[in-house]
């Protein structure tokens, strides 16, 4: 092995640009340096959002985003990610390889600069990528800084090059190895346990993100493999699309491969596969580009017979959770066009009001994916697109293509209009119902539901409300609460399955009315999160199947009609114990799972304790606990276990609720069979 501190700077080929392709040389001179890495280890949250599970997975996606940039530029079509047996992660792509030539301003190989200097990457300065999805250069250097060690291997300029790092610092110079005709980059890293609260990766979290990436990058193959011992026990019981890979003489490993030739058209088909009947059989596919402004848009859309809207937008493959100008252009074009068409074809008479945007989008599943040279992100989480040119471009393209599609498919267009009119009728009926109930005070927080045991504090940030199924459990909860800041709302039985009902019917449900008035925010178009009366909404149901069903019904309602509560982190699931282990009169412990029960019993026996066969009590429901037991195990802030409901991926959550609460029985059975062993918290 020859150790070269001054790698040969061969002249790379220059690719000229279609959309997303390289517009200049991708060599050492294309790597621009903006600032150092000093602060990353001191304040990691500023760069990756958190040092919890979400931040840990962000490391993986930052490295993968760099490989996706190569795919966007047309130079890579395969990305292979492996969770190693020792907890490391390896990301391999078949792109051109990070350049190894010397960066003039630094006097170091480009690969070392990219890995050790913040904001050093090929997307800055205009000489590298015309479209970039990740923080290219920022991400991989931050990953390096927050890892105990990193190994990089680059195949470029006819050789294989390697370099190793420890805590962000090179441990040796970039080494030139054997000759090779292949190209690509391999980054292997081990996250620092002194920085992160956990270094345990979730196969499901990564596979969901990679499936989304594969949908958004037509023709890209993304493979995820898990070589950890814990993965071998669940091979064959994984997420949809998971394969098990087995080499003769070796145990199978858990792996999944995603490849979608149809891109976002396949994404819409996937999301609509659980949505019941379709209003039109083919997905509407829009694809347009403005090369001069380095702007392109892909849209896939299809209406189904359900009542919820599922419009998801992306900019440079980044999920724009907060929407933005591309969504605004899409909505404006569609609302204007459908109303004009409905009047021209006499579906709407002169005296009729226009259809609202929400009427037209009822049952619509759509993916909007724009790619821009200089995306401007705004909003609280920097996931709202701000480019004004995106709105005008998308609005123009959608209007042109949708007008043409309606003219060529008059029967399907008529069905879409009829569904929109039905939605408008229901919306007006719901408005009248809201006005009526508002006059009666049923939806106003000023007239709280009679069964609500409210708390004394008026500070929402300190207040929490427990939604409890059944009056008996509600009675125990009321007695066991801290009345200063804990409120109790008992609900009777299972609330309405909102997945199968329109808003007018939903607002007639007594339990739904109680929830809306207790929370104080209003619902749907009247929703105002500033009026929320409790910053913790805690769903407290039995630990059995019925209890989980009730929680799922409640979560479906919150997701469909009060989604900002979930997005803002206000919704929690309580975790009541399953067992009480009695060692003696005043010596007992609680267990929250079968495994914990067995472990506590075994530990007790090792410590010389004895237990009778009838000394392990299984709680069948919250009503079996007295007020003191409920307080200690499930309500006391010092002892309880809560699971915060998070929303990392709205499209995946939409699909999950469609599976759990929709009409497709077989899809629901399949999901439960695959995931039954892993369900502890519903983390969506």
UniProtKB/Swiss-Prot annotation:
<dbReference type="InterPro" id="IPR014721">
    <property type="entry name" value="Ribsml_uS5_D2-typ_fold_subgr"/>
</dbReference>
<dbReference type="InterPro" id="IPR013506">
    <property type="entry name" value="Topo_IIA_bsu_dom2"/>
</dbReference>
<feature type="site" description="Interaction with DNA">
    <location>
        <position position="494"/>
    </location>
</feature>
<keyword id="KW-0799">Topoisomerase</keyword>
<keyword id="KW-0460">Magnesium</keyword>
<dbReference type="InterPro" id="IPR000565">
    <property type="entry name" value="Topo_IIA_B"/>
</dbReference>
<keyword id="KW-0963">Cytoplasm</keyword>
<dbReference type="InterPro" id="IPR034160">
    <property type="entry name" value="TOPRIM_GyrB"/>
</dbReference>
<keyword id="KW-0479">Metal-binding</keyword>
<dbReference type="Pfam" id="PF00986">
    <property type="entry name" value="DNA_gyraseB_C"/>
</dbReference>
<dbReference type="InterPro" id="IPR013759">
    <property type="entry name" value="Topo_IIA_B_C"/>
</dbReference>
<dbReference type="GO" id="GO:0006265">
    <property type="term" value="P:DNA topological change"/>
</dbReference>
<keyword id="KW-0067">ATP-binding</keyword>
<dbReference type="Pfam" id="PF01751">
    <property type="entry name" value="Toprim"/>
</dbReference>
<dbReference type="GO" id="GO:0005524">
    <property type="term" value="F:ATP binding"/>
</dbReference>
<dbReference type="InterPro" id="IPR011557">
    <property type="entry name" value="GyrB"/>
</dbReference>
<dbReference type="InterPro" id="IPR002288">
    <property type="entry name" value="DNA_gyrase_B_C"/>
</dbReference>
<comment type="similarity">
    <text>Belongs to the type II topoisomerase GyrB family.</text>
</comment>
<keyword id="KW-0238">DNA-binding</keyword>
<dbReference type="GO" id="GO:0006261">
    <property type="term" value="P:DNA-templated DNA replication"/>
</dbReference>
<feature type="site" description="Interaction with DNA">
    <location>
        <position position="497"/>
    </location>
</feature>
<dbReference type="GO" id="GO:0005694">
    <property type="term" value="C:chromosome"/>
</dbReference>
<comment type="function">
    <text>A type II topoisomerase that negatively supercoils closed circular double-stranded (ds) DNA in an ATP-dependent manner to modulate DNA topology and maintain chromosomes in an underwound state. Negative supercoiling favors strand separation, and DNA replication, transcription, recombination and repair, all of which involve strand separation. Also able to catalyze the interconversion of other topological isomers of dsDNA rings, including catenanes and knotted rings. Type II topoisomerases break and join 2 DNA strands simultaneously in an ATP-dependent manner.</text>
</comment>
<keyword id="KW-0547">Nucleotide-binding</keyword>
<dbReference type="Pfam" id="PF02518">
    <property type="entry name" value="HATPase_c"/>
</dbReference>
<feature type="binding site">
    <location>
        <position position="542"/>
    </location>
    <ligand>
        <name>Mg(2+) 2</name>
    </ligand>
</feature>
<dbReference type="Pfam" id="PF00204">
    <property type="entry name" value="DNA_gyraseB"/>
</dbReference>
<dbReference type="InterPro" id="IPR013760">
    <property type="entry name" value="Topo_IIA-like_dom_sf"/>
</dbReference>
<dbReference type="InterPro" id="IPR020568">
    <property type="entry name" value="Ribosomal_Su5_D2-typ_SF"/>
</dbReference>
<dbReference type="InterPro" id="IPR001241">
    <property type="entry name" value="Topo_IIA"/>
</dbReference>
<dbReference type="GO" id="GO:0046872">
    <property type="term" value="F:metal ion binding"/>
</dbReference>
<feature type="domain" description="Toprim">
    <location>
        <begin position="463"/>
        <end position="577"/>
    </location>
</feature>
<dbReference type="InterPro" id="IPR006171">
    <property type="entry name" value="TOPRIM_dom"/>
</dbReference>
<dbReference type="InterPro" id="IPR018522">
    <property type="entry name" value="TopoIIA_CS"/>
</dbReference>
<keyword id="KW-0413">Isomerase</keyword>
<protein>
    <recommendedName>
        <fullName>DNA gyrase subunit B, novobiocin-sensitive</fullName>
        <ecNumber>5.6.2.2</ecNumber>
    </recommendedName>
</protein>
<feature type="binding site">
    <location>
        <position position="544"/>
    </location>
    <ligand>
        <name>Mg(2+) 2</name>
    </ligand>
</feature>
<dbReference type="GO" id="GO:0005737">
    <property type="term" value="C:cytoplasm"/>
</dbReference>
<feature type="region of interest" description="Novobiocin-binding">
    <location>
        <begin position="154"/>
        <end position="302"/>
    </location>
</feature>
<dbReference type="GO" id="GO:0046677">
    <property type="term" value="P:response to antibiotic"/>
</dbReference>
<comment type="subunit">
    <text>Heterotetramer, composed of two GyrA and two GyrB chains. In the heterotetramer, GyrA contains the active site tyrosine that forms a transient covalent intermediate with DNA, while GyrB binds cofactors and catalyzes ATP hydrolysis.</text>
</comment>
<dbReference type="InterPro" id="IPR036890">
    <property type="entry name" value="HATPase_C_sf"/>
</dbReference>
């Amino acid at each position: 092995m020859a150790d070269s501190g001054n790698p040969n700077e061969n002249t790379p080929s220059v690719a000229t640009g279609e959309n997303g392709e390289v517009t200049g040389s991708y060599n050492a001179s294309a790597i621009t340096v903006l600032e150092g890495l000093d602060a990353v280890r001191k304040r990691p949250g500023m760069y990756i959002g958190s040092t919890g599970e979400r931040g840990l997975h962000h490391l993986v996606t930052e490295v993968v985003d760099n490989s996706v940039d190569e795919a966007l530029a047309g130079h890579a079509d395969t990305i292979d990610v492996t969770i190693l047996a020792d907890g490391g992660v390896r990301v391999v792509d078949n792109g051109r390889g990070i350049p190894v030539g010397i960066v003039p301003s630094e006097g170091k190989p480009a690969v070392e600069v990219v890995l050790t200097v913040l904001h050093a990457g090929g997307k800055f300065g205009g000489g590298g990528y015309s479209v970039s999805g990740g923080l290219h250069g920022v991400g991989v250097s931050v990953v390096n800084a927050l890892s105990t060690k990193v190994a990089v291997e680059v195949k470029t300029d006819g050789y294989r090059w390697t370099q190793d790092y420890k805590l962000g610092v090179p441990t040796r110079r970039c080494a030139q190895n054997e000759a090779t005709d292949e190209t690509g980059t391999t980054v292997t890293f081990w996250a620092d346990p002194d920085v992160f609260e956990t270094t345990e990766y979730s196969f499901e979290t990564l596979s969901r993100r990679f499936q989304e990436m594969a949908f958004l990058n037509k023709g890209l193959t993304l493979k995820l493999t898990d070589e950890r011992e814990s993965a071998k026990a669940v091979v064959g019981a994984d997420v949809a699309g998971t394969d098990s890979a087995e080499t003769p003489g070796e145990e199978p490993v858990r792996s999944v491969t995603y490849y979608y030739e149809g891109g976002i058209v396949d994404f819409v088909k996937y999301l609509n596969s659980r949505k019941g009947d379709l209003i039109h059989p083919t997905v509407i596919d829009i694809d347009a580009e403005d090369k001069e402004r380095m702007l392109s848009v892909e849209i896939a859309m299809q209406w189904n017979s359900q009542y919820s809207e599922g419009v998801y937008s992306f900019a440079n493959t980044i999920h724009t959770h907060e929407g933005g100008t591309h969504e605004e252009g899409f909505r404006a074009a569609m609302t204007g066009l459908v109303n004009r068409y409905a009047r021209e074809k006499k579906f709407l008479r002169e005296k009729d009001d226009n259809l609202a945007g929400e009427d037209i989008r009822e049952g619509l599943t759509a993916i909007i994916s724009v790619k821009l040279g200089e995306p401007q992100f705004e909003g609280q989480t920097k996931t709202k697109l701000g480019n004004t040119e995106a709105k005008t471009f998308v609005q123009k393209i959608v209007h042109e293509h949708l007008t043409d599609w309606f003219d060529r498919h008059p029967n399907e267009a008529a069905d879409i209009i009829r569904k929109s009119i039905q939605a408008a009728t229901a919306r007006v009926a719901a408005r009248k119902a809201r006005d009526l109930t508002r006059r009666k005070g049923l939806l106003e927080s000023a007239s709280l539901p009679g069964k609500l045991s409210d708390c004394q504090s008026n500070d929402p940030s300190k207040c929490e409300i427990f939604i409890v199924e059944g009056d008996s459990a509600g009675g125990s909860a009321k007695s066991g609460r801290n009345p200063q800041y804990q409120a109790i709302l008992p609900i009777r039985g299972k609330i309405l399955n909102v997945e199968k009902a329109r808003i007018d019917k939903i607002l007639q449900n007594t339990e739904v009315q109680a929830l809306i008035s207790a929370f104080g925010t209003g619902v749907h178009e009247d929703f105002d999160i500033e009026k929320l009366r409790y910053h913790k909404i805690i769903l407290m149901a039995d630990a059995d199947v019925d209890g989980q069903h009730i929680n799922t019904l409640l979560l479906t309602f919150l997701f469909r009609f009060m989604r900002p509560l979930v997005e803002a982190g206000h919704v929690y699931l309580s975790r009541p114990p399953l067992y009480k282990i009695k060692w003696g009169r005043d010596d007992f412990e609680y267990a929250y799972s079968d495994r914990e029960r067995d472990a506590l019993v075994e530990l007790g026996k090792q410590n010389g304790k004895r237990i009778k066969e009838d000394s392990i009590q299984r709680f069948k429901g919250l009503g079996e606990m007295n007020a003191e037991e409920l307080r200690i195990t499930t309500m006391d802030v010092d002892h309880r276990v809560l699971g915060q409901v998070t929303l990392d991926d709205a499209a995946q959550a939409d699909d999950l609720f469609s599976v759990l609460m929709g009409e497709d029985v077989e899809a629901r059975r399949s999901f439960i069979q695959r995931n039954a062993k892993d369900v502890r918290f519903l983390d969506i």
